[in-house]
C-alpha cells in the first residue's frame, strides 16, 4: 500500500467516523427538540441541556438558584422523562460530598436510542 493510498483510506475512515458522530448528535438533538416541546406544553421548568459529541446522549442540568427549587425542578423532570420513556431511570444516584453538596443523578440508558442523564447539585445553604 502506498503512502497516498494509506492517507486516502485514513481520511475516508475519519470522514465516516465523523459522519457517524454527527448522526448520533442529530438523533440526540431531535429527541431534545421533542422533549422541549412536551416540556413547554406540560409547564416544566427550563433547565440547561448539552448534546453529547461521542454518543447519542443528552445531559440535563437543573440550575435554579434556590436549592429547594433546584430539587423541585429535578423531580419534575425526573417524573416527566420517566413518563415519556415509559419507565423510571435505569440508574439513580444520590450522594453527598464532604462539603455537604448532594448530587442527584438519574440516567435512562436508551430512551429512543439516546442516553439521557439528569443532574442537580444541591448545595448546603447557610
Predicted feature residues:
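Structured alpha/beta or helical-core interaction and ligand-binding surfaces enriched in interleaved
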Residues: 2-126
Amino acid at each position: 500500500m502506498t503512502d497516498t493510498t494509506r492517507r486516502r483510506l485514513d481520511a475516508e475512515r475519519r470522514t465516516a467516523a465523523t459522519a457517524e458522530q454527527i448522526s448520533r448528535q442529530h438523533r440526540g438533538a431531535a429527541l431534545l427538540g421533542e422533549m422541549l416541546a412536551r416540556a413547554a406544553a406540560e409547564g416544566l421548568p427550563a433547565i440547561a441541556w448539552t448534546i453529547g459529541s461521542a454518543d447519542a446522549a443528552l445531559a440535563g442540568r437543573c440550575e435554579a438558584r434556590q436549592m429547594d427549587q433546584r430539587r423541585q425542578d429535578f423531580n419534575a423532570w425526573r417524573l416527566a422523562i420517566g413518563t415519556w420513556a415509559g419507565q423510571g431511570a435505569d440508574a439513580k444516584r444520590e450522594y453527598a460530598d464532604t462539603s455537604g453538596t448532594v448530587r442527584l443523578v438519574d440516567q435512562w440508558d436508551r430512551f429512543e436510542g439516546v442516553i439521557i442523564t439528569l443532574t442537580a447539585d444541591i448545595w448546603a445553604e447557610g
